[in-house]
């Protein structure tokens, strides 16, 4: 059981992107990365004890940055799914969003949470529980 922090790669700005690998007492391992708070891999045993990665995830930072519209394991937002015509209304006020899926907005457009760098706010290795890595995303205007 434990948590390992290591450099996963570098983003297009040259910043280090870290991964955090957590292993429990049963040998199950998950890896999250700071870019998009992505769940990059989950390795667990099948009924025969053979371990395999059971989630889709990219192998490097560049693939997460470009993504080709695939949001493997990332946190999407501020909105998730499609917003028709890239606009919506709240209390009579119309809000317009970037069009990135034909005439629609998909998963917040080109600058959603999946493209943001999330920072670790807590790492906990409690011997009575599995490890915890807590990722935090603050709005730029609230730093």
Regions found by a protein language model. Name each.
Residues 1-143:
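Surface-exposed acidic/polar loop and edge beta-strand patches at domain peripheries
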């Amino acid at each position: 059981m434990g948590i390992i922090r290591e450099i996963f790669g570098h983003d297009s700005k040259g910043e280090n992107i870290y991964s955090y690998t957590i292993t429990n007492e049963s040998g199950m391992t998950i890896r999250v990365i700071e870019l998009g708070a992505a769940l990059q891999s989950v390795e667990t045993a099948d009924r025969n004890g053979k371990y395999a990665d059971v989630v889709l995830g990219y192998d490097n930072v560049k693939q997460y940055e470009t993504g080709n519209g695939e949001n493997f394991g990332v946190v999407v937002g501020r909105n998730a799914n499609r917003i028709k015509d890239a606009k919506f209304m709240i209390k009579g006020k119309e809000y317009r969003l970037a069009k990135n899926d034909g005439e629609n907005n998909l998963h917040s457009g080109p600058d959603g949470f999946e493209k943001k760098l999330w920072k670790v706010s807590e790492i906990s290795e409690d011997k009575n529980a599995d490890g915890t890595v807590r990722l935090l995303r603050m709005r730029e205007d609230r730093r």
